[in-house]
């Protein structure tokens, strides 16, 4: 059972304000107190916050293939063990394990593995929670494949999706697809009926088709700017529609590579902090040295902050969530409340779990992260358990 904790003298980023020199109490894995005054009840452990640190809701990464040597498509318990245990280092307290376009049997194995791991292993770990699965492909456009292997791309297939969702035990929460590959929007309509997010991505659709897809139930955009038709003033394409259409919540990889800092700022200005979600889209090389790694059956060369296929195509990222938050502070001068929105609250709302995650609120899961003024992670708490403490946090 998680111990009772008291975090004291810290700036607390709540839904509506930043409480200075506040207190957050944790009992039985839940937030029990958020106050400007010290609670009267005793706690088994007290955490004195470092000077100028900030308490945020735990970050939720809804689009992550892997990191630290692991990849969702490895379809092994050790893969999810690694992701769950290492993601708190970057402030992530929950995530969607993300697949890639592959041979159908390989996708099935990854889905079954996630279901079985969550049932058998997760409760014994003190790390990030697996909220479900983001199925990226294979129902995408070969014209905008990006790093999705073209040989396994196929048109949308509702029956195949139903099979996969059964194998996943209902864990598929987001499906990235191209609407032009979904005849009569059959899959989009099915996803809406099942309360699964239909995300437009790896698509060459025009604005009219996307607007029709939104009417059918599409509500999300996968990694804005990447693997999609570009903006033109006479045909806004996917980018223009994502920015201007109020019906779409939009993902963004804020690494300064997948999108220029000004493009990231434009996304923030257009969508505001209520309809933008930071993601990493990271692959297994995150946290490792430069070198050649496998991603979706392809060789990816990692140098510095970039991961590229042999033809120069970007192949996922090696971004960490706290780095994305820092970049957005730099690119947009946004507030800490904005950061809480785009790293946690919006994802929780989109997934329909805002009743238990996504904000520093009494009664919710104690998923919390303490960061420095430049978004370095100092301490991460997952469901009331201390999952990560930085080496520099000697005073805690």
UniProtKB/Swiss-Prot annotation:
SUPFAM superfamilies: Composite domain of metallo-dependent hydrolases, Metallo-dependent hydrolases. This is N-acetylglucosamine-6-phosphate deacetylase. Its EC number is 3.5.1.25. Belongs to the metallo-dependent hydrolases superfamily. NagA family. It catalyses: N-acetyl-D-glucosamine 6-phosphate + H2O = D-glucosamine 6-phosphate + acetate. Fe cation 1 binds at residues 63, 65, 136, 281. Keywords: Carbohydrate metabolism, Hydrolase, Iron, Metal-binding. It comes from Bacillus subtilis (strain 168).
């Amino acid at each position: 059972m998680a111990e009772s904790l008291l975090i004291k003298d810290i700036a607390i980023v709540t839904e509506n304000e930043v409480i200075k020199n506040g207190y957050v109490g944790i009992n039985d894995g839940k937030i029990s107190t958020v106050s400007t005054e010290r609670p009267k009840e005793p706690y088994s452990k007290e955490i004195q916050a470092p000077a100028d640190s900030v308490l945020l809701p735990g970050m939720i990464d809804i689009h992550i293939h892997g990191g630290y040597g692991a990849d969702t498509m490895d379809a092994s318990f050790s893969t999810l063990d690694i992701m769950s245990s290492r993601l708190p280092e970057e402030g992530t307290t929950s995530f969607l394990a993300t697949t890639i376009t592959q041979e159908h049997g390989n996708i099935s194995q990854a889905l079954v593995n996630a279901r079985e791991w969550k049932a058998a292993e997760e409760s014994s770990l003190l790390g990030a929670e697996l909220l479900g699965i983001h199925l990226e492909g294979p129902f995408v456009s070969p014209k905008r494949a990006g790093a999705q292997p073209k040989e396994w791309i196929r048109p949308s297939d509702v029956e195949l999706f139903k099979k996969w969702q059964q194998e996943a035990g209902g864990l598929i929460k987001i499906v990235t697809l191209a609407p032009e590959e979904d005849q009569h929007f059959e899959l989009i309509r099915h996803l809406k009926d099942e309360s699964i997010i239909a995300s437009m991505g790896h698509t060459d659709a025009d604005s009219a088709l996307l607007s029709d897809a939104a009417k059918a139930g599409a509500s999300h955009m996968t990694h804005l700017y990447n693997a999609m038709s570009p903006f033109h003033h006479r045909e806004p394409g996917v980018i223009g529609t994502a920015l201007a259409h109020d019906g779409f919540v939009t993902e963004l990889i804020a690494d300064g590579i997948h999108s220029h800092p000004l493009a990231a700022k434009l996304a923030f200005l257009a969508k505001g902090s209520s309809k933008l979600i930071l993601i990493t889209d990271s692959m297994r090389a995150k946290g490792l040295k430069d070198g050649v790694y496998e991603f979706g059956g392809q060789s990816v060369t990692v140098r510095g902050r970039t991961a590229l296929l042999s033809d120069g195509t970007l192949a996922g990222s090696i971004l960490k969530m706290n780095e994305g938050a820092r970049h957005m502070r730099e690119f947009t001068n946004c507030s800490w409340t904005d950061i809480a929105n785009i790293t946690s609250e919006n994802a929780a709302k989109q997934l329909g779990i805002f009743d238990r995650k996504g904000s520093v609120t009494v009664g919710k899961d104690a998923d919390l992260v303490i960061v420095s003024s430049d978004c370095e992670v100092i301490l991460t708490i997952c469901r009331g358990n201390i999952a990560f403490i930085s080496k520099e946090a000697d005073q805690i």
